[in-house]
Amino acid sequence: MSEDNNNGKEYILDADSELRFEIEQKDAKVFVTLISGFAELFGTELVKKKKYEFGIGAKVAIFTYQGCVLQVTGKMDVCYISKETPMIQYINCHAALEQFRTDAEEHDKRGPVILVVGPMDVGKSTLCRILLNYAVRVGRRPLYADLDVGQGAISIPGNIATILIERPASVEEGFAKTAPLVYHFGHKSPSGNSVLYNAVVSKMAEVTLQSLDANKRTKSSGIIVNTCGWVKGYGYKHLLHAARAYRARAIFVLDQERLYNDLLRDVPSNVHVVLLPKSGGVVERTKELRHESREQRIKEYFYGNMRTPFYPFSFEVKFQDLRLYKIGAPPLPDSCMPIGMKAEDNKKKVVAVTPTSSLLHHILTLSFAESTDENVIGTNVAGFCCVTEVDMERQSVMLLSPQPRPLPPNALLLWSELQFMDNHA
């Protein structure tokens, strides 16, 4: 039910219903205020009388367990109230996880590790956000691991990352991305280098599981793992690999019964596999929208957003000062490989890259590794820069970077297929 007034429109929501809206127009802004009752956005409670702002690309679902009144101003492309919502099932999942965590706390063991899986555009990252928010609201400190290299919920696309969640996500900006643990992959899909993808997932899982033991509260809180939407063929094998690497206690499958049954067959019987419905508010994104979303994530890394703008630096680096590498050499048959090596080992080989004009717009990853003698694949990264100009005459590139010149001593840069067109005025 909705009522118009001079300050916009008031929506009266019954218990266990949600207001859904989308914003697609470029300069549109929508403001939402909780007038009365209790409501939450993906597990984060709304504060009464506080005005929340949403812009282009926002796909919002404000849920209430008890009923509420919301005031909404601004132009939305889609807006409606729905009583068909999976939130009750999601809160039941949280309750089950809390039982695991309480048991882990009492016996000083690791809390539950949960994989959230499903095809593209079924709400995997949203479910992760809900479960993480519910966990911190009851005093937990879970880890959040993001294996979705295509979109990047924690770091920029083309990488996998983990953060510690200590407080609920901001309604408008999501989780604070403080001190993330990030590993370079360099492609927007695991299919770009399946061998490398499994290697970096294994490494991050190893480090993340070890870090659980460093803090008692985090240890019992466990890990929520978001995964890619590639669930067939090699994509399915990547899911099984991730489940093994993270020693998953449970797998939440969104909206695909076939995937649910395949996992029931293929994972150990002590792993709980749970089929969950997706929200009716989940919107299927086109290829173009997914590309725009990647661009926006990279832009926010360099320039921030309306509320927290960043001011990156641009500086010149000579070719001779660039220590640039790529992970993965062209495949060779086993017969051409050195004794003891397999063709798949080439997929993890660190290869020097000669700077050319083809570097233009590519993202470069700054590794904490200082030489190729170190385990570059297993070393996390310090940050990213973007090649905004290549001057073959001057034998130099212009880099866009969050930090001023110069690059750190012994800086080792890794090539990524991800590109960013810096049109920022």
From Swiss-Prot:
Superkingdom field: Eukaryota
Keywords for this protein: ATP-binding, mRNA processing, Nucleotide-binding, Nucleus
PANTHER family: CLEAVAGE/POLYADENYLATION FACTOR IA SUBUNIT CLP1P (PTHR12755), POLYRIBONUCLEOTIDE 5'-HYDROXYL-KINASE CLP1 (PTHR12755:SF6)
Any GO CC annotation of this UniProt entry: tRNA-intron endonuclease complex
GO MF annotations, alphabetized: ATP binding; polynucleotide 5'-hydroxyl-kinase activity
SUPFAM superfamilies found in the cross-reference section: P-loop containing nucleoside triphosphate hydrolases
Binding residue positions for ATP: 18, 59, 121-126
Example of a GO biological process term: mRNA 3'-end processing
InterPro entries named in the record: Clp1, Clp1/Grc3, Clp1_C, Clp1_C_sf, Clp1_N, Clp1_N_sf, CLP1_P, P-loop_NTPase
Family statement drawn from the similarity comment of this UniProt entry: Belongs to the Clp1 family. Clp1 subfamily.
HAMAP family (UniProt xref): Clp1 (MF_03035)
Main subcellular location of this protein, as a coarse class: nucleus
Chain's role: Required for endonucleolytic cleavage during polyadenylation-dependent pre-mRNA 3'-end formation.
Keyword Ribonucleoprotein among record annotations: no
Protein's name according to its UniProt entry: Protein CLP1 homolog
Localization terms from the record: Nucleus
